[in-house]
């Protein structure tokens, strides 16, 4: 009976190890699963501003840095600021990890007020009426030196929200809404 119990314990231990390995985060999530600082470097192509923000210190979000990012992502046309979903910053940080780059992100559009969104809708069919930009949950961007198609592929692989691909306008859209793509 003792030999049976010893073998049973070994089997249970091996099963536990195998189960633990199966539920470990994939490389796509590794950048978020380890408690380390998360830093984003961005350029705003409309305002000419640049920012380097450590928005997460390994234990939690840094409110002062989030406030700086909220200002950076503001609707520059109406000069309105909205709190941006921190999940969007996590998504962008993770995306850069998948792409193997920390080059500055070139922000084209972040938050848009409803008035600005309606104004843009009047000029373009590609602007959604209920855009995630108006909720502070979306951004349009590119990264110098990284092919848009590669940014799109990496964003799709995360299955973390919406991914829009606009090669003629030279940007990719990501948001923290339901996973979908266009």
Curated annotation (Swiss-Prot):
Exported by the Tat system. The position of the signal peptide cleavage has not been experimentally proven. L,D-endopeptidase that cleaves meso-diaminopimelic acid (mDAP)-mDAP cross-links in peptidoglycan. It works in conjunction with other elongation-specific D,D-endopeptidases to make space for efficient incorporation of nascent peptidoglycan strands into the sacculus and thus enable cell wall expansion. In vitro, is able to cleave the mDAP cross-links of soluble muropeptides and of intact peptidoglycan sacculi. Shows a weak D,D-endopeptidase activity. This is Peptidoglycan L,D-endopeptidase MepK. One of its GO terms (molecular function) is endopeptidase activity. Residues 1-30 form the signal peptide. Binds 1 zinc ion per subunit. The gene is mepK. Zn(2+) binds at residues 133, 140, 173. Its cofactor is Zn(2+). Changing residue 173 to A: Loss of activity. Changing residue 140 to A: Loss of activity. The keyword Transmembrane helix does not apply.
């Amino acid at each position: 009976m003792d030999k049976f119990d010893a073998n049973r314990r070994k089997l249970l231990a091996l099963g536990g190890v195998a189960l633990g390995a199966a539920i470990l985060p994939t490389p796509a999530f590794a950048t978020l699963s380890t408690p380390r600082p998360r830093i984003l470097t961005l350029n705003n192509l409309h305002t000419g501003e640049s920012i380097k923000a450590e928005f997460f210190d390994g234990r939690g979000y840094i409110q002062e840095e989030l406030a700086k990012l909220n200002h950076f992502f503001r609707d520059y046309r109406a000069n309105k600021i909205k709190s941006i979903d921190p999940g969007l910053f996590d998504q962008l940080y993770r995306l850069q990890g998948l792409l193997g780059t920390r080059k500055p992100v070139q922000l084209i559009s972040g938050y848009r007020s409803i008035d600005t969104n309606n104004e843009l809708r009047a000029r373009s069919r590609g602007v959604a009426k209920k855009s995630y930009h108006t909720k502070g949950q979306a951004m349009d961007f590119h990264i110098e030196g990284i092919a848009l198609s590669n940014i799109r592929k990496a964003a799709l692989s995360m299955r973390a929200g919406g991914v829009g691909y606009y090669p003629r306008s030279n940007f990719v859209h990501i948001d923290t809404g339901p996973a979908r793509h266009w």
